[in-house]
């Protein structure tokens, strides 16, 4: 049975393999396509915004594009994007055999998290790729992903939260570091459904992390944290732009440095309690 499950996982990996993104690259960075707006996106360092951004442009030899031009300028190997700004659009033209390609490009200084797969209430196989503005090469991983949440995970929600578990090529858990956060295989994508600015939850948590008192056992576990670290990212799911999310660590035993129950000596070394519903008991505790 294990062998059969492994073969099925390999088959899924072949179908949903780590994507090769680009028809072209900009300063070695992959561009990501959003089919909803017919726009390519690329993540570059924030200090490039408000400046003329000089970039080397390279076509992917396997993509079939030729005769690339940007804003009417034929591209040999480089181009200067004038006064880069958020949401500023640059017109792109190219040939793909006999087909004319007319599309557009825009820049962001937020990391781009690309997910591929068909996800729902239960875990399903897929993959993720994280493109940081500070790194030319993406971080790639197989993953299993599902929708996350209670009241935020109902049929009327237009923007889903996600739970991501990173896997290796054998379908086993694989701990990786994303955007400088802890190495783990357990990640949360928070949609900020009632946070119209998509930033308040993240900023509030960062403020908490700045002034929160260390756990009482900090002398024994100096790396214990009482708040999670997270980063703001833009998410593209199956070539469709899904908006701004907060990619965070999980608040768990690992974050709090809690030791498991000692069966031998029958000792508790710490417990983590989580609210599962907003019932009367919960409100009584919080009042």
Across the structure, where does each feature detected by a protein language model lie?
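Bacterial Sec-dependent N-terminal signal peptides
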Residues: 1-23
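Phosphate-handling architecture centered on phosphoinositide signaling
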Residues: 25-57, 63-65, 72-287
